Regions:
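N-terminal targeting leaders
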Residues: 6, 20-64, 68-130, 135, ...
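SH3/SH3-like beta-barrel superfamily modules
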Residues: 62-64, 75, 128-159, 201-233
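Boundary regions of SH3-family modules and the immediately adjacent low-complexity/disordered segments
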Residues: 76-101, 150-184, 194, 199, ...
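Beta-loop motif signature
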Residues: 110-133, 182-211, 265
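Active-site nucleophilic cysteine motif
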Residues: 257, 269-288
């Protein structure tokens, strides 16, 4: 009976707002706009990695608040601010992850070789990034698709087929399990330890699968959803052995980058199947167990900032070089492109495809367009695991879920 009364009162409140007001976001009271904007700057200044999305229905001093946020403190501050301003608020705003709707399964592991993530929960929506098989993610919300957050904190929507949902115990089991890491740019998992057997799926560099054992020239593996198969030993390496063998010096990183020459440009791509400019940087470093921010405009503000000398003498191989529009008195530089510096004015980048260009006008590989929009560089390799945004899979919080308990 009490629940029925609450629902009836809720209906009356909603009806009065809808009938009394058709207020859109452009017609919100100025004090509400100021409060909302100020809190967004504090709690979610970059909407790619944090959410503070509000929707108001207003009638006089009454309002219904809807929307989502990843910061409980942001919602609390908003409600306090609206209350102090004299508004009577019906709170329908959700703090993510939405534990109740997801029934406790607020974790997940990517279940496809390359998983496409979108701005909206729709295949027709713009693709914004990708995630790789075996990657742990935070599951925030369900709306036909899942809204997830990847280990670099990027937030986007993924189709249900892309992620295996898990609770905290299940993701801990996954993180603690021994794994193999795919080291070939492209390969397959087979249903039997035989290349002539039925394929289970394709795989790409950086994929991780649970290691169940070995049979002849194959590793037996398991997917997040429990499927099993076999990966050729030539295409993968046990994770612990892989970590020990990794070299993280600029020469080794550039050697990896060169193996991607000719791979086509793909907007939002972050795999050896196809990549955009920042996706190339991210893919190359991930193949050396380094996790950095997703986009060029995020990568530009981690590590050591370098103002580039006219003869490029203060650049080192492995530095990231950035391109775009220079800063003005009104705004900071607008970064739209990135490459990895090779030396002697040359850099490798993804633009059309992965190739080498030069900033030196006397070089036959001179790229006049990008030379004209060169901004600055950053040095990130020495700062891995020394800045929150720069880490590895053995220190990143997503890959550590449940691991500390067993250490």
């Amino acid at each position: 009976m009490r629940k029925t009364i609450h629902l009836f009162l809720f209906f009356l409140f909603l009806t009065s707002l809808v009938q009394a007001s058709g207020v859109g976001s452009n017609d919100l009271p100025a004090d509400v706009i100021r409060l909302t904007d100020s809190l967004k700057q504090v709690y979610a200044p970059d909407g790619r990695v944090a959410l503070f999305q509000t929707h108001y229905t207003v009638s006089g001093r009454k309002m219904m608040l809807r929307g989502v946020t990843t910061a409980a403190a942001a919602k609390e501050a908003l409600l306090q601010g609206l209350g102090k301003a004299g508004y009577e608020v019906m709170d329908c705003m959700k703090v993510l992850p939405d534990e109740a709707a997801l029934e406790g399964k607020t974790y997940g592991v990517v279940n496809l070789s390359v998983c496409n993530l979108h701005v909206k929960p729709d295949f027709a929506s713009e693709m914004t990034t990708q995630a790789l098989l075996g990657m742990p993610v935070r599951v925030l919300q369900f709306d036909g698709w899942y809204r997830i957050q990847t280990p670099d904190n990027y937030i986007a929507w993924v189709h249900r087929a892309g992620v295996r949902l898990m609770d905290s115990a299940e993701v801990a089991d996954w993180n603690r399990a021994e794994k193999i890491v795919v080291t070939t740019h492209y390969g397959f998992v087979y249903s039997a330890p035989n290349r002539r057997s039925q394929t289970v799926s394709d795989i790409v560099a950086g994929n991780r699968l649970k290691w169940l054992g070995s049979k002849r020239d194959f590793y037996k593996v398991a997917y997040p959803d429990g499927r099993t198969g076999y990966v050729e030993k030539a295409d993968a390496c046990p994770e612990k052995q892989w970590r020990k063998s990794l070299k993280k010096d600029p020469g080794s990183i550039l050697k990896t980058a060169y193996t991607l020459i000719g791979v086509p440009y793909l907007w939002a791509g972050t795999s050896s199947k196809g990549m955009d400019c920042s996706g190339l940087v991210r893919t190359v470093l991930y193949m050396h167990d380094m996790i950095i921010p997703r986009d060029a405009s995020q990568q530009a503000y981690v590590g050591e900032h370098i103002e580039i000398a006219s003869d490029f003498s203060n650049l080192q191989p492995g530095d990231l070089v950035f391109f775009g529009s220079p800063a003005t008195a009104e705004r900071k530089a607008r970064v739209v492109h990135v490459g990895i510096y090779i030396g002697q004015g040359r850099f490798i980048h993804s633009q059309g495809d992965v190739h080498v260009s030069s900033l030196d006008a006397s070089d036959p590989l001179f790229d006049a367009f990008n030379r004209g929009r060169l901004l600055f560089a950053t040095r990130v390799i020495p700062y891995i695991n020394k800045m929150d945004e720069l880490n590895t899979t053995d220190t990143n919080p997503y890959y550590r879920w449940g691991v500390e308990e067993s250490d």
